UniProtKB/Swiss-Prot annotation:
An example Gene Ontology molecular-function term: GPI-mannose ethanolamine phosphate phosphodiesterase activity
Membrane topology classification: Multi-pass membrane protein
Protein name (record): Metallophosphoesterase 1
Entry's cofactor comment: Binds 2 manganese ions per subunit.
Amino acid sequence: MMFKHLVPLRNGFNKERTSRLKARLFFLSTIFGSILLVFFFCEFLVYYLVIVKCSWPEVKGAHKEDSTPVLKVMFLADTHLLGEIRGHWLDKLRREWQMERSYQSALWLLQPDIVFILGDVFDEGKWSIPQAWSSDVARFQKMFRHPPHTQLIVLVGNHDIGFHYDMTVYKLSRFEKTFNFTSGKLVSPKGINHILSSSFVLLNSMALEGDDCHICRAAEDQLRRISIKLNCSRMREHPDFQKKCKNVEKTPVSAPILLQHYPLYRISDSECTGEDSASPEEKKVLFKEKYDVLSQDASEKLLQLLQPRLILSGHTHSACEVLHQGKIPEISVPSFSWRNRNNPSFIMGSITATKYSLAKCFLPTENTIIYIYCTASVLLTGYVLACLWLCICQRIHSGRKQKPI
């Protein structure tokens, strides 16, 4: 019983120890919880919060009670998946995660019927050896996976097979085999809304050089065959229809939508407007035919042969709207990747057999994500310093209380 007076001291010591342990656990859980919360927001949640604001545009003149099917289409461009030559692992990880989360979030929220990627899928396809190509394709298929009810169609770009004089039969065949792509392919989505609602013409821009090369000649022959199909679809009421179009495959009566990587000929981006158009310095640069845009001759030939109602293209990485022949609009789709622009986006189209309506959906900007991470880092650092200062002050105060007189 002689140590009975030490029991309160021991209890007080245990309480103080428990209190300190709880304080440390609270401190650590706050730090790690905050880090996880910021990470979850920036790498997952922010994509849903931004894309959920986008909605399919209504087709003017089409009523909800109307039985005319509306095709919901997403158009994106210039994903530029990095390869083994120029692709730093951190750059590859960051930008490809951004595109994967953007794409998967858009699919889940918007439920498109069909998705078109307008070329330059890869950054180093023109150089890739077979092993590197297989690796890049596997990464692409993982990033742009999609449910069975959504169709994904990929067009070829100059970074996939090279510019005209770098393009070879081997590289083109490799791309065509991987993505089931053919220049001059006429796509009429069947099974979607159970009707042929519209036609899309897919082109290999690099094969429109006009120099009668083997690849170019095959592409132009296919283009002429498509022109015949489209002309026959327009003359079904003509007296000579059966005579001229007896053995021609039927296509939707509507004018087609032309999809390709290069824009049609224009002098520059000087007339382009919008927050995601080219910078003032880039707008001053004159475009080079057959490199930045199609040649003037090839552009006029396409408009004459196909008579499209709408054109969508990529390649420039910036947005632009151009009116050809005073009646045919062309939309240049900005890049989908942070690597090419800070504010990537994609185009949403509601399309019927005779009408269409387009809207743009912006993705989270890279600057926003960086700002959130920096702000969170500053706040957490301030919190840690404040806790350390408070701990030091408490120890000093505790030491003074226990100091003997």
